[in-house]
Amino acid sequence: MNLRQQLTQFLTMAFVFSSSFMAWKTLSVVTNSHSPVVVVLSGSMEPAFQRGDILFLWNRQRQNKVGDVVVYEIKGKDIPIVHRVLREHHNSEKQYLLTKGDNNLVDDLGLYAKKQGYLNQATDLVGTVKAYLPKVGYVTILISENMYARYALLGIMCISSLLTGE
């Protein structure tokens, strides 16, 4: 492979990565969410959502209502949580939410940060679930939880790259 082909291959890969990044950032701006697509990681929302479902979020509504499925983050924890709004109250400017997983026995007070009784809709929510694809995200769970699957995927990608020259 000559220098021109290698440079073309590099530029093609750079274009693919930059296009993917721009598509993600555009989706983030449109949905007003830093993470507009999430994968369900646990069974706490069964039967509504199963582990591995991909959820599409929207974060442009001013208020959430009881029954909405929301994704929120706790300060100091990296993993977003998908649960249903159990109770809400608000004052003139802020809305506060109490959530619970459909498959859980108790509400989420024990999950919230210390001395936090409710979620602040403006600061804690990543978004409200508007659509989903069942089981499609299970591949990401398999790769993140299984070291052998990760190495197998990496090996397949390397072999494919060597054989096709791309």
From Swiss-Prot:
This is Signal peptidase complex catalytic subunit SEC11. The lineage of its organism: Eukaryota, Fungi, Dikarya, Ascomycota, Saccharomycotina. It comes from Meyerozyma guilliermondii (strain ATCC 6260 / CBS 566 / DSM 6381 / JCM 1539 / NBRC 10279 / NRRL Y-324) (Yeast). The gene is SEC11. It catalyses: Cleavage of hydrophobic, N-terminal signal or leader sequences from secreted and periplasmic proteins. GO terms for cellular component: signal peptidase complex. Its EC number is 3.4.21.89. The keyword Transcription does not apply. Belongs to the peptidase S26B family. It is a single-pass type II membrane protein.
